[in-house]
């Protein structure tokens, strides 16, 4: 969703990042008069965010938590409190509330992929809240997104666990593999891109030992060198990263 604004607001974006907007912005069109959506005036933003914060922290037992998250996200995007980055922050807010309200123990599910895949419908659903007051349709769309993202997260977790288990099996079966290579392999999910010096520090060992451990993993095609250089070489657990970024 492109945010159009006057030239002074465009100039202010870089210098006012993280600050509440002090000028009027709008979405689509060349001016507020022909815009697709015009957020509240800047002098209302602080009070509207305060209301939203009170809603987040107030007990609402009559509303399921996922429904509350749907309402919070839509309201945040409607307030549009910043000149830039509102979409990213709004999506992060979903993940933060899922974890903070105990629906996820870890941030393992993100709706960003679903919302990007259904971008036009996402914008349409937000629009009909504002034009028709149709919150039910938005909540239904949001919950469908949660179900889809949860299923995709489950598939990704299974794929990642299968990859790690298979690579571990191959490493344990390798006759020349030693303790340092085993330990380094178990660290890969926490540092899927690294240099030999990083491995040395993580293993708390000598450079030759760390280098041999990396070489073992490279020979098994678990990691691969990605720079093509003879010095300052970087290694990547590429298959793992690919699954994470799918």
Spans of model-derived segments:
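FIC/Doc superfamily catalytic core
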Residues: 1-246
């Amino acid at each position: 969703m492109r945010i159009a604004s006057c030239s002074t607001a465009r100039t202010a974006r870089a210098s006012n990042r993280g600050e509440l907007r002090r000028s009027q912005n709008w979405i689509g069109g060349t001016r507020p008069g022909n815009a697709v959506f015009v957020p509240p005036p800047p002098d209302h933003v602080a009070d509207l965010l305060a209301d939203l914060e009170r809603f987040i922290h107030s007990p609402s037992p009559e509303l399921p938590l996922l429904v509350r998250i749907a309402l919070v996200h839509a309201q945040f995007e409607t307030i549009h409190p910043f000149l830039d980055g509102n979409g990213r922050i709004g999506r992060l807010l979903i993940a933060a509330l899922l974890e903070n309200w105990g629906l996820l123990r870890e941030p393992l599910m993100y709706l960003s992929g679903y919302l990007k895949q259904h971008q036009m419908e996402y914008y349409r659903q937000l629009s009909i809240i504002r034009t028709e007051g149709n919150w039910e349709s938005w909540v239904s769309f949001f919950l469908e997104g949660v179900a889809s993202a949860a299923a995709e997260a489950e598939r990704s977790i299974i794929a990642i666990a299968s990859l790690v288990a298979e690579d571990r099996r191959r490493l344990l079966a390798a006759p020349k593999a030693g303790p340092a290579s085993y330990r380094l392999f178990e660290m890969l999910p926490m540092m899927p891109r690294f240099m030999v010096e990083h491995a040395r520090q993580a293993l708390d060992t000598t450079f030759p030992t760390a280098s041999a451990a990396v070489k073992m993993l490279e020979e098994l095609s678990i990691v691969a060198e990605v720079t093509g250089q003879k010095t300052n070489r970087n290694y990547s657990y590429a298959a793992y990263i690919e699954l994470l970024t799918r």
